[in-house]
Amino acid sequence: MPKYFATCARGLEPVLAEELRALQAHDVVPGRGGVAFVGDMQLLYRANLYLRTAIRVLQPILEAEVRSPEELYQVVHDFDWDRFLTPDHTIAVDSNVRDSGITHSKYAALRVKDGICDFFRERHGRRPSVNVEKPMVGLNLHIHADRMVLSLDSSGDSLHKRGYRPIQTRAPINEALAAGLVLMTGWRGETPLLDPLCGSGTFCIEGAWIALNRPPGLTRKWFGFMGWMNHNMTQWTRLRNQARADMAKTLPYPIAGSDIRCDAVNFANENARSAGIGHLMKFERYDVTDFYVPAGPPGVLICNPPYGERLGEDEDLRPLYRTLGEVFARSPGWRCFVFTGNSSLGKQIGMKPVRREFLFNGTIDCQLLEFHP
């Protein structure tokens, strides 16, 4: 069976591995920035449809030692591309190069393209065209320490692009990271979920999709595998229809968010409607100082407060973190989580975290802090 590699934000590898095991993937091995696994084409479809924390699902097809652009070209040119492409395909190459004798990512991608096109020109008299916007077959080149891996990109656009968030507030976290953080809390829909600093509403929307068993890729119109020679449209349609039939229609417990900013609340409600769940939840305007958990069974409270990326902002944000500590203190029985990129601000909460997970939000070193008031 083919080998695959699903990429994710650093720190989410254990969560992604758990997702893959739930999909019955074989030989699941977490790595740096992703998880390797083995499976058939059906599993590849399910991975793209169901994975909440993955960014891309890649199928490595060529690995070699290359120390120069010329060596890279030759390795690619000598590969049997008739197994995966025809001259009628359009292609694009995305590349990432580090710690290598090949120093320029764009030039490396160009040499891969040249190798593929020359292969077809010499064998068939025609070559694939390049379409960087929407290629029929996307390729991903990764070179580290002179070791190259060239993969087919089965996802196309990044899987974090769910399609429900055209409207964003300042500095949102992406959907895949938000879903991963919710999953990292252990929450699966069996208790209430609240966000007192909801921003775009991403935690709550991703949480609702988890509780409803709603696959994040359900309404996506194009995946990279749809341009592959071995794509089975009948099998894919059957799988997606079954996923739609398996969804719940109502939330077992409340999911809600609030924010002091009117624009954020309006954006969050619009995003929830775009996600098809606007009728199941409502975002309201509250100052966090006035936030109280509702009566009833305790659940999970999760938020992503600002963490002062610019010089001098720490002092302005300390009262907000102290207020979060007060909110947590009056929420006995609830498990409270803060995702922050500033450990000194996290200390302003005034409680000792019972758990600390280390992750990255882009290039920012962050922590998910868990508190039990």
Question: Locations of the language-model features?
Answer:
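Non-catalytic nucleic-acid substrate-recognition regions in nucleic-acid-modifying enzymes
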Residues: 1-137
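Short beta-strand/turn micro-motifs composed of small residues
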Residues: 8, 259, 340
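Phosphate-coordination loops involved in phosphoryl transfer and adenosine-cofactor binding
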Residues: 87-90, 190, 251-252, 298
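A short, flexible beta-alpha/helix-coil linker loop
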Residues: 98-101, 158, 306-310
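SAM-dependent Rossmann-like transferase core, predominantly class I methyltransferases
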Residues: 150-184
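Conserved S-adenosyl-L-methionine
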Residues: 173-292, 309-310, 314-316
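C-terminal catalytic and target-recognition region of SAM-dependent MTase-like enzymes
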Residues: 287-373
